[in-house]
């Protein structure tokens, strides 16, 4: 298996929002360029070590919609969410990856912006 840093590089130039957190601490370990840009960050160093809920949702406690306890390596959970911080409707795909070198698990979230495609029938769940 590739090293985790090689996996992060794969996401770097994607046109989707991608971030990864340490599943145990909620600390951000990776954000791709698009995600850094939408949150007004200059580099990954500006995000690393910060709690995902503090940076991405501007809250002091883990999000009520956090699905970390339902994620598994190799399987994706797909859901829709309106993010008021960035004012975008997103289709989210979440999974876990495991670092074969040390056994650590990371939550990876890929967000596809569906703001322009969203339908009028309320398929987007707002929290």
Regions found by a protein language model. Give the residues of each.
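Per-ARNT-Sim (PAS) sensory domains and their PAS-associated C-terminal
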Residues: 73-75, 79-93, 98, 103-105
């Amino acid at each position: 298996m590739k090293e985790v840093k090689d996996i992060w590089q794969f996401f770097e130039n994607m046109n989707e929002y991608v971030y990864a957190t340490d599943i145990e601490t909620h600390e951000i370990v990776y954000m791709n360029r698009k995600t850094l840009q939408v949150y007004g960050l200059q580099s990954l160093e500006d995000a690393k070590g910060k709690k995902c809920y503090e940076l991405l949702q501007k809250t002091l406690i883990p999000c009520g919609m956090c699905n970390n306890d339902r994620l598994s390596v190799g399987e994706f959970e797909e859901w829709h969410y309106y993010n008021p911080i960035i004012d975008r409707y997103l289709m989210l795909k979440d999974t876990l990856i495991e670092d074969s070198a040390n056994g650590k698990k990371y939550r990876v979230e890929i967000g596809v912006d569906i703001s322009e495609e969203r339908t009028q029938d309320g398929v987007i769940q707002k929290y």
